[in-house]
Amino acid sequence: MRERFDSEYIRSELERISDHLETPLTVYLIGGGSMSFRNLKETTKDVDLVVTDGDALQQLQVVLLDCGYEVIKDPSEEYHELSAQRILENADGCRIDVFNQKVVDKLVLSEGMCDRSVTHLEAGELTVALVSTEDVFLFKSVAGRTDDIDDMFTLVQTGLDFDIVEAELEQQIDLLGRELFVSYVNEALMSLDERHNITTPLFNPVSKITQRVYRELEVFHAFDDAIPRSCNSERGIASSNA
């Protein structure tokens, strides 16, 4: 079983990272680390950091390597699904997942998310911002890891503004140009209902979008399956007329 780390440890690691920075770097803390700093979670296995561009990604990786972190070259299937650009771990077993704008290959760190975030730590050249609890809830809903549903339940207890969550969901659809990721949100909301008997105001709009996604997928697959048969039929007619 992997080690878990509290907010004090995470803060000390972030401050250690700041000691190695020579130019400004802003990172956005999502997931369990963000919840830990808000006293919503005692410990977490991973520190999920989002940066806004490739230069910041490279800068953070270099600093983490300087701090003794090593790149995890063969993460478990659970981590493959996260689609982090970099996964690094230190000697204590603290793992940092680094994302460049896109998280879990399903959500983008949007302008609205950045605007809603709050600065939690400023140390040297490092600025650490916590994304809002509403946005953490949305990230958790697509992450697909074991503890995420329980974390979503904890977040609901804080009195989330689901108008914000729904508006961000619509914004993500516009940014990504597709709705498929909403089906993952739907699965998470169903699990939340089954495990904790909690139905959020997000359930109905997400369910409607998911039904539309499934209908479109059915049409696509039906069309895709029909193409070989159509081609074979045309070839048969051609040969019979020869």
Please provide the spans of the model-predicted regions.
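Compositionally biased terminal segments of proteins
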Residues: M1-A242
